[in-house]
């Protein structure tokens, strides 16, 4: 019997074993460091990950102290010897910018929303320290009809 070689990737400098359920960097990080380590907006078990919102971006180097690349962790496969960085000033600024852009197309008066205090966007914005956005002229959404063409999406969209 030959023992299989353990496959390891590094999260913020610490080694972790890559398991069979670690199909993406996001799943890998969540399994060891919890749900909140990398923020997400479009991560949902009922949807295939495709990196649309980019809030889950992390930096990855293919070797220790090598050059890094920013990737969407939800759809980037975890690989042996990857060095994954979950938070730094650049990533925080990127995430804040993305969420601020999303907020420009979102009603800012959360008190009137039916999901106030139970809203993923509100939670991520608060976690990133966003209380207001710097982009002017947000859409007002007054009179905008809800898209009711699919029941699952209807349960996610609260305008």
Task: Give the label of every model feature segment.
Residues 1-2, 67:
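Short solvent-exposed loop/turn micro-motifs enriched in small/polar/acidic residues
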Residues 3-14:
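Eukaryote-biased recognition of intrinsically disordered, low-complexity regulatory segments
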Residues 6, 26-30, 122:
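Short glycine-/small-residue-rich flexible loop motifs, especially phosphate/cofactor-binding loops
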Residues 11, 31-32, 127:
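Residues at alpha-helix termini
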Residues 16-70, 76-80:
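N-terminal cofactor/phosphate-binding cores enriched in small/glycine residues
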Residues 25, 157-158:
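Extended hydrophobic/Leu-rich segments
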Residues 54, 59-157:
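Fe-S ferredoxin-like electron-transfer domains
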